[in-house]
Amino acid sequence: MSARWTTAVLDPQMTGGLAVARSPEGFLVDANGALFPRDWLKRQDLDVLCEHGIGHFDGQPVFLLELRSATDVPGCSWRGLRAFMLEGDFDTYKVLGYAAQIGTWAREHRFCGSCGQPMTQIRWERAMYCQPCDLRSYPRISPSMIVLVTRGDEILLARSPRFVTGVYSTLAGFAEPGESAEDCLVREVREEVAVEVKNIQYVGSQCWPFPHSMMLGFHAEYAGGEIVMQPDEIEDAKWFSVHDLPPLPAGRSIARYLIDLYVARRLGCDIPAFPS
């Protein structure tokens, strides 16, 4: 949340307010950004799959129009969520990140996973409902551990084949059923690079709407083992000196914060601000 943005469950039968439109190609934008007068947006020829009330921005109600496909709108274009994270106003990114998670959930829960019947939107809580099964489906949140492994003035960074060319980052992975956060961290580090860790310290968390992760960030000290990269997951992993680092993740990510925080502490620099 921010001073300008708060989430809320709003009834789409309300009138007025602001709205964002999301398609498989991203969010609709014009010269003024991604938040449009709702009445104007609903007059456009959009292929609307569903509508959800998602919160308040600067005191105005905000709604999401989740679209089946992108539509040409004069004076507008489509922009992916990552572009807003890297370049746009961060308050707007918070709105769109939440909208993206709700849109993904709404798109994937149109039908009951038990009986296959259409689900209906509950207007007073964030849930979809199957009346025949009396089953509610809530937005999915996937807990993921992200960890910077440290060894004095060295940090262990790795590359996934999916990364931007040249960029190295921290290790991360999703929790399995029955695991604690610490259990997951130890397992993921062992699986990805075959080293052991100790002195695990929780640092903070960040919502990561790509598509619905909750990143729990840690520092952990190296305890032993030689790096052996996990096939298909890790294409390179090595120790880097805090004085000589490779290209790193985006500054608004918790991965970058874990790195910057440790480096600042080792070098006696100012502690960076946590990405909100």
Curated annotation (Swiss-Prot):
Occurrences of domain Nudix hydrolase (ranges): 139-262
GO molecular function, one term: RNA NAD-cap (NMN-forming) hydrolase activity
E.C. numbers: 3.6.1.-, 3.6.1.22
Record text on cofactor binding: Divalent metal cations. Mg(2+) or Mn(2+).
PROSITE patterns: NUDIX (PS51462)
Sites where the protein binds substrate: 82, 125, 138, 206-213, 255
UniProt-listed Gene3D superfamilies: 3.90.79.20, Nucleoside Triphosphate Pyrophosphohydrolase
Positions bound to a divalent metal cation 3: 188, 192, 233
InterPro entries reported for this sequence: NAD-cap_RNA_hydrolase_NudC (IPR050241), NADH_PPase-like_N (IPR015375), NudC-like_C (IPR049734), NUDIX_hydrolase-like_dom_sf (IPR015797), NUDIX_hydrolase_dom (IPR000086), RNA_Hydrolase_NudC (IPR022925), Znr_NADH_PPase (IPR015376)
Listed cofactors: Mg(2+); Mn(2+); Zn(2+)
Residues engaged in binding Zn(2+): 112, 115, 130, 133
Positions bound to a divalent metal cation 2: 188
GO terms for biological process, alphabetical: NAD catabolic process; NADH metabolic process; NADP catabolic process
GO cellular component: cytosol
Keywords: Hydrolase, Magnesium, Manganese, Metal-binding, NAD, Zinc
Protein family (similarity comment): Belongs to the Nudix hydrolase family. NudC subfamily.
NCBIfam families given in the database record: PRK00241.1 (NF001299)
HAMAP family on file: Nudix_NudC
Subunit structure: Homodimer.
Name of this chain's protein: NAD-capped RNA hydrolase NudC
